[in-house]
């Protein structure tokens, strides 16, 4: 997968994740010895091109949020590399890492807990500017007010506290905070999952407008396929710490090549009650990442699995069609 092509659009690669691994130790006993490892993210690789949005989708617990946080080193990786403009972020320390982080920001999932309740939102938005030593106090205030205006808030809102805002407004504040440093790359970690449907579209459209204006690159993490389809250029599907499919938005939604992706697609509600779609019902529950299945991690729930092969050999991401990567031994059977 590390040889993933750059694509026909000619845009250069901004982010290149290679073999990313994040395992969490499980400790037990009086001496808190390590008894096992939760394989939250297990050898995933992908690229994100300059100016595009890559959607990262999967069920809760599949590792998508951990992948995003590890990329920014909010949690330290177990192994792998993350190249940003050709520089390995995982190899940076001290001032070099701090300088790199100015170009990489995150919008958190929960707009209620991601803001300090004791801090006026103007201070929250300008805090990153102060940490990175951007300008003087007057210049930082101008950038802060401009960032608030960009997300649809007014200058008088800067003195108010988070509890005085609605959920949608708080998420806009989170976006303004990420935008203030004028980064090149933003990870949006389920930014609309805690919002009403009527507010979700407003926030999504805001993200798209800001991307066009500031030439931003997004990693958009979500579990809602309809949301991912609305905003993404390409989509990666995760299952139990692995990427099982990666393709353009149009290709993935028209021709899903992995049985897990097909099951997710079949669960999307149709807007017309007179239309029906054949549901793909998966058997059993998602296995534990503490003890994942051998071979293909999806094989215990897969409707086309051949036990002797799928349980013994782990499939690798391979190019099923141009720019369409699938991790399945029998993906051709679904064509």
Q: Can you annotate each of these PLM segments?
A:
Residues 4-13, 26-32, 37, 246-335:
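Short catalytic/signature loops enriched in Gly
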Residues 30-35, 89-105, 131, 137-138, ...:
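ABC ATPase NBD coupling module
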Residues 80-88:
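Conserved ABC transporter NBD signature motif
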Residues 87-88, 138-156, 185, 262-266:
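Conserved ABC ATPase "signature" region
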Residues 161-165, 169:
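Conserved ABC ATPase signature
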Residues 180-184:
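A short, proline-enriched helix->beta-strand linker immediately N-terminal to the Walker B motif
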Residues 187, 191, 195, 199-277:
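P-loop NTP-binding/switch modules centered on Walker-like glycine-rich loops
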């Amino acid at each position: 997968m590390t040889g993933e092509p750059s694509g026909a659009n000619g845009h250069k690669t901004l982010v290149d994740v290679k073999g990313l691994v994040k395992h969490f130790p499980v400790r037990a006993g009086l001496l808190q010895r390590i008894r096992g490892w939760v394989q939250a993210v297990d050898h995933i690789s992908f690229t994100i091109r300059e100016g595009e949005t890559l959607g990262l989708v999967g069920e809760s617990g599949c590792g998508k949020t951990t992948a995003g946080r590890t990329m920014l080193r909010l949690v330290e990786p177990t192994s792998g590399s993350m190249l940003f403009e050709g520089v390995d972020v995982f190899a940076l320390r001290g001032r070099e890492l701090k300088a790199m982080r100015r170009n990489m920001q995150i919008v958190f999932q929960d707009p209620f807990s991601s803001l300090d309740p004791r801090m006026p939102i103007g201070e929250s938005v300008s805090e990153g500017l102060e940490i990175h030593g951007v300008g003087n106090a007057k210049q930082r205030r101008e950038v802060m007010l401009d960032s608030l205006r960009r997300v649809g808030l007014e200058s008088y809102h800067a003195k108010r506290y988070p509890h005085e805002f609605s959920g949608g407004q708080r998420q806009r504040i989170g976006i303004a905070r990420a935008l203030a440093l004028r980064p090149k790359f933003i990870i949006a970690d389920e930014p609309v999952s805690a919002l009403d449907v009527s507010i979700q579209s407003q926030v999504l459209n805001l993200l798209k407008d800001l991307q066009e204006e500031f030439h931003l690159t997004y990693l958009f993490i979500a579990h809602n396929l309809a949301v991912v389809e609305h905003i993404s250029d390409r989509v990666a599907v995760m299952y139990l710490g692995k990427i099982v499919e990666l393709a353009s938005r149009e290709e993935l939604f028209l021709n899903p090549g992995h049985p897990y992706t097909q099951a997710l697609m079949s669960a999307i509600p149709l807007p017309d009650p007179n239309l029906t779609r054949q549901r793909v019902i998966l058997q059993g529950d998602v296995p534990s990442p503490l003890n994942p299945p051998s071979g293909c991690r999806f094989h215990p729930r897969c409707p086309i699995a051949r036990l002797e092969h799928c349980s013994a050999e782990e499939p690798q991401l391979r190019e099923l069609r141009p720019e369409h990567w699938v991790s399945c031994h029998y993906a051709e059977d679904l064509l």
